[in-house]
Amino acid sequence: MAAGSACGMFGSWASAARAAAKGEKLYDLPRAGNVSFLHFTDCHAQLIPIYFREPSVNIGLGIMNGRPPHFVGEEFLKFHKVPANTALSHAYTYLDFEKAAKAYGKVGGFAHLATLVKKMRADRPNAFLLDGGDTWQGSATSLWTNGQDMVDACKLLGVNMMSPHWEFTLGAKRVEEIVQKDFAGKIEFLAQNVKTTDFGDQVFKPYVIREQNGIPVAVIGQAFPYTPIANPRYMVPDWTFGIQDDNMQKVVDEVRSKGAKVVVVISHNGMDVDLKMASRVRGIDAIFGGHTHDGVPQPVLVSNPGGKTLVTNAGSNSKFLGVMDFDVRDGKIASYKYSLLPVFANMLPADKEMQALINKIRAPYQAKLQEPLAVTEGLLYRRGNFNGTFDQLICDALMEVKGAEIAFSPGFRWGTSVLSGQTITREHVMDQTAITYPYTTVTDMTGEFIKTVLEDVCDNLFNPDPYYQQGGDMVRVGGLTYACEPGGKQGNRISDMRLKGQPIDPKKTYKVAGWAPVAEGAKGEPIWDVVETWLKSKKRITPRALNLPRLIGVQNNPGMAS
């Protein structure tokens, strides 16, 4: 079931890296069945190798406490039986991040991912390559090419099927153009839960059935259910979304009735939602999940009225490739083997054809991408339930440039990391901000309304029912301090809000800066311009002091760094 302990012989980051350079066995993975899937998700348009720090806070509550994906650091290693100070422990956790990153180098990059895909397909020539979505957004080149860079890269990579989320922020017209023209006859764009608002017609194919080694296999797509809530509704005005368990059951029953012996779902629900769906819908063999960026080494086996379903999640940023082998005998799955392989750029040579495409894509923008803006003296990262240091930088820039007392920055999970001592380039800033609605805003808000905003976002993150978790991580906050009780009741999780040590007055008005408004017609200076202005004025960026809330009731949670 596990990705294995292939690097267990390593005793330190340095010795592990030296052994890896000599050719360790991480990627020696013989086929273990007759139906295979390769899965990546949430690459967020990262074509070149990057640094990416995994979260130190990923809190699970209620039934989600103490089960994947809500483990971090040492608790993660303990639960998943991953040896410390190894390639795998670096890939899966934040532990000693900078030290390990310098030892192992960058991760991901489509040229290195392509090499790994080809290596896995050499032993699995008919394996399906699944793309879990959030592929066409997240970088400067994806924004500037309207997603074309990633469309071309995915075609060359050999993707067979995908399901969407951030793709919809390019707008319905652009999505349909890509599906109907670029993907025609090449990549299946699947979403059983996207329908027209007028008659409820299916907008995209809900599934495909294809044979692999003579065995009929159904692949069903599940788009992010809350796209019109988490992202601008006006970009997809004529389509409805939602989880749609009942429709999923109908689709599963339909493909089974058509003879499918293996049924899998490419899902962008998020792992907690997938776990609940797996407990309710019968007949799914595996859910290949995304959205929550959880690199989970082993599948979770979930019981339901019809049997059992495997649930996986394959991380983000082209940092991982999931490999699932099913051994199908007499029309049933007799056994399976799953591995979540980290993509270390120093261990996998760049595929020449993919590298040539990437070079071609980036060439017109290279000077613009690499323009130096400042040097950071501390590690910059985003991922985690609460403020990351790059988010703190964005909040600090918003408050100073816009003259605001308080700043809010969205709790996006995407965004690469920058090591201390590195030059911050325009590309790094775009990695944090490249969206189609980048407008900054300055709004007068009462203390009462500020609390309402924080409570609403907090409920989206920590609602005890996964089906009501409708967004990303907690909104990032600058200037304002507060306490948060994740396990509290709706409307009562936020307390002790203060500005410069003084309690927030519910009736008083405060000047609040933010960005990424979802309302139609919003305008304002793009966030990347604000951040660039601030960085250039500073030249050297001192380590950011994280404005983290005082957390209540989660002291022993395995999703909290010790």
What is each PLM-predicted segment?
Residues 169-174, 181, 240, 270, ...:
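General structural signal for secondary-structure boundaries
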Residues 67, 74-75, 79-81, 86-92, ...:
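A short C-terminal boundary segment appended to hydrolase-like catalytic domains
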Residues 216, 379-380, 481, 503:
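Short, solvent-exposed loop/turn motifs
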Residues 4, 8-345, 385-397, 461-463, ...:
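Acidic, metal/ion-coordinating pockets
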Residues 115, 119-122, 177, 181, ...:
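Charged/polar, solvent-exposed surface patches and flexible loops
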Residues 23-36, 40, 46-62, 186-193, ...:
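Feature captures C-terminal
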Residues 111, 148, 173, 246, ...:
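Generic alpha-helical secondary structure signal
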